[in-house]
Amino acid sequence: MSPRQTVFLIAGIFSIIGIAVSVIIIAIGGGFSGASTSITDPPTDADLWRIGQKINDETELNYSLTIFGSVSSLTGAEVSINFSEGKSDDWKTNFHLINDTIAEDTTILLSKQQLIPKNSVEEEFKQYFRLIENSILSIRDIAREPKYLVIGAPWDTIFVGASSIPVKVIQKENIKTSVGNFDSFIIGYKIGSKTSKIWLTHEVPLPVKAEVYNSEGELWYRYRLIGMKL
């Protein structure tokens, strides 16, 4: 074999090794684990979840919401979120919140990219919008860019004191709701003895359900999708 042929052979071997390594990296998703990923079946763009995906003009999402807190709480509330076309890059979004003692609503412009407010919130609704932001809309904090809905996929890291806690996809589950059954993925993280869980599905632009605990292991808030029009 001539020196020139030897060089081509070595280059070909390294190319094959490089491709194999790339496939392995994709398959484990930079840290993915679990039965749903493999070298022959790596995650693709179809596995990505984007906040606000599938929102259309007149999309409506209805939730039951309860928040437990020493400073602010909300018991047995229903939250209705209605989207309509605003400008090219935002949604004109109506929020309606009601329970036994509250009946409030307001309209806010939310960015289509990340559902971030683009105008000021009316003063009388600020405290209620803060509760919605800290619960139903808090998925924005860990889905700042598209993330994989694949078991083991890392989503974020949260810090409690000196400890760093991974947030990742921990489970796949068929969840039954009043608007139908969904094949969902559970985003989870564990603080102390309690695991906080957020259920996501490709069919719904925001979480379907959540049960989130504080650092003392006490239930902080829970919500569930109870109505939907896409």
Where are these regions (language model features)?
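N-terminal Sec-pathway targeting helices
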Residues: 1-19, 25
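Flexible, processing/modification-adjacent segments and terminal tails
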Residues: 119-178
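Polar/charged alpha-helical tracts
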Residues: 2-6, 41, 53, 123-130, ...
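Acidic/proline-rich low-complexity IDRs
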Residues: 8, 108-109, 114, 130, ...
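Sequence-pattern detector for short linear motifs
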Residues: 7-8, 99, 133, 143, ...
